[in-house]
A protein has these predicted regions:
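Active-site loop-to-helix "anion-binding N-cap" substructures in soluble metabolic enzymes
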Residues: 1-244
Length: 244
């Protein structure tokens, strides 16, 4: 089975109820050659699901707690995301790792909880600029893969997103050879355990570079940040993926 193509939009801490009007345009203009996912802030998740009304657009969370319930003020359980209509959840994003001190073990525990709740876990990995400059990119990502993917992961319930930290929201992107090298390493590292897992690239993906990025071997889609907030910016990326 070939990996599924996925265009995933991460709205981060952006958007409000009025912004849900963008979803109408995304639903109306989306291509059928790939899956399309939007991960809004938690307060918009259920309103977004309700607005779609059972359409083909997928909706996901941006994080979940490793516990199923309990005294964890401000946190969200994976089962609560699923109950609200989510199909996916982003885990281990570099902003969570940096801002909240999340470790690989934390990410693995959250992914296990996501799988238990029936969610697809999008597990993020990526190197900092210092690690890239030091020539340790592949070692860093190999360690993140080993530590962040739980033993219950399968190609069906897991997606891997490679996001070089220094490229997120900066307008900078690695060159094609750098992206290809990392994606080939990830594919090889997971060939025995997750042979058909989808591998996404993230980091300043936009309409202008999407076609070129999707032509790279082992790139099955994208995790898109700012360019997913407006349908006019996101739909060309979706179209490029569907055509790849």
């Amino acid at each position: 089975m070939a990996p599924r193509k996925l265009a995933a939009g991460n709205w981060k801490m952006n958007g409000d109820l009025a912004a849900l009007s963008q979803i109408d345009a995304i639903v109306a203009g989306r291509e059928t050659g790939c899956d399309v996912l939007i991960c809004p802030p938690a307060v918009l998740l259920h309103p977004m699901v309700a607005r779609i009304g059972g359409g083909d657009l997928l909706v996901g969370g941006q994080d979940c707690h490793h516990a199923g319930s309990g005294a964890h003020t401000g946190d969200i359980a994976a089962a609560q995301l699923a109950d609200a209509g989510a199909s996916h959840v982003i885990l281990g994003h570099s902003e969570r790792r940096a801002d909240h001190g999340e470790t690989d073990a934390d990410v693995a525990a959250k992914a296990r909880a996501a799988h238990d709740a029936g969610l697809i876990a999008i597990i993020c990995v990526g190197e900092t600029e210092a690690e890239r400059d030091a020539g340790t990119t592949l070692d860093v990502i190999a360690a993140q893969l080993q530590g962040s993917i739980p033993d219950c992961a399968t190609s069906a319930n897991t997606v891997i997103a490679y996001e070089p930290v220094w490229a997120i929201g900066t307008g900078r992107t690695p060159d094609n050879a750098q992206i290809a090298e990392v994606h080939a390493m990830i594919r090889d590292a997971l060939s025995a355990t997750l042979p058909d897992v989808s591998l996404l690239y993230g980091g300043s993906v936009k309409a202008a570079n999407a076609t070129e990025i999707f032509a790279i071997d082992n790139v099955d889609g994208a995790l898109v940040g700012g360019a997913s907030l407006k349908a006019a910016d996101f739909l060309p990326i979706v179209s490029a993926l569907a055509a790849s």
